[in-house]
Amino acid sequence: MNNLKQGKFITFEGGEGIGKSTQSQMLYEYLQSQNTPVILTREVGGTIVAEKMREILVHEELLPMSELLQAMAARYDHMARKIIPALQEGHIVICDRFIDSTVCYQGLELENGIDLVYNLHKTLMPSLMPDITFFIDVEPDTAIKRVNSRNMNNKFDIRGIDFYKTIYYCFKELSNRFPERIKTIKASDLSPLEVHELIKKHL
């Protein structure tokens, strides 16, 4: 915990179709039931301005650097207007996606992209990283079947299995690089409730 924060910052990460949003919502509802001050938000988005940027990011084909800067601009607004104030008030903040998604979705398209994204984040938002990140580990073949069954149509949903595998192995690499922060929850064969119970054990 750094001196910018009084609360706790929890993020959920992984590819498409893995249940991040479901788990974020379940944890939010659980903490509410415990009378814990908590907010639930998401990226890209979370504020009026950032949600408008999201529409461009998920539907338009941007140049790789433009896409990265769009994501970072949205995050800066989100952090300044919502996440940091909530943490300073002592809330737990649960965020569906954060910096690790930017690394895997935008950084891989750029030379030295992983370090570039983390360094840019540190420049814009020094010392502010999640306290704990849950990587929901679902095999790409399972994830793409889930996405196809729900008929989603943003540009990331409709990319093929090679894209899903690239994203998956990127998150695996990050979980190995930052094992103290990123907790891997193997979820391919588990129900949402079983995944939720595993997550609670890390709190």
Swiss-Prot record:
Top EC group: transferase
Protein name, entry field: Thymidylate kinase
InterPro entries reported for this sequence: P-loop_NTPase (IPR027417), Thymidylate_kin-like_dom (IPR039430), Thymidylate_kin_CS (IPR018095), Thymidylate_kinase (IPR018094)
UniProtKB keywords: ATP-binding, Kinase, Nucleotide biosynthesis, Nucleotide-binding, Transferase
Binding site for ATP: 14-21
One Gene Ontology MF term: ATP binding
GO cellular component: cytosol
UniProt-listed CDD domains: TMPK
Signal peptide: none
